[in-house]
Amino acid sequence: VTVDIVVPDANNLTLVDRAMTAQFDQILKNYCRIWRATGPFNHSKLMAIDGCWAYVGSSNLDPRSLRLNFEVDLEVLDRDFAEALEKRIDRTIETASAVTLEGLRNRPFVVRLLERILWLGSPYL
């Protein structure tokens, strides 16, 4: 199983980005890959699985957004659509930079500490 997560390289909300980054090490340790996408800020939430199932929506893919927030999401069970979405995601990854455990560990301690503190407030961000 390959799980690729693509997030913006430059987030429009710095505090949210810092809180999100605090959890990257846990994701990478569980054999997922994280990519920082370059270019204009992209706020889309997309998911494609095995070229046969797709998800497009406004909600973040977390329990709070999926249960508590008023969002619009669409599940698509169409092979052509899912394959096209996978190709779009793959094109984004081609120009993205990989986030690595080594890169995360090499950041200054004060940055890592700040991110962990902000992560504590992430349910409110």
PLM regions and their residue ranges:
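PLD/PLD-like phosphodiesterase catalytic module centered on the HKD motif
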Residues: V1-L125
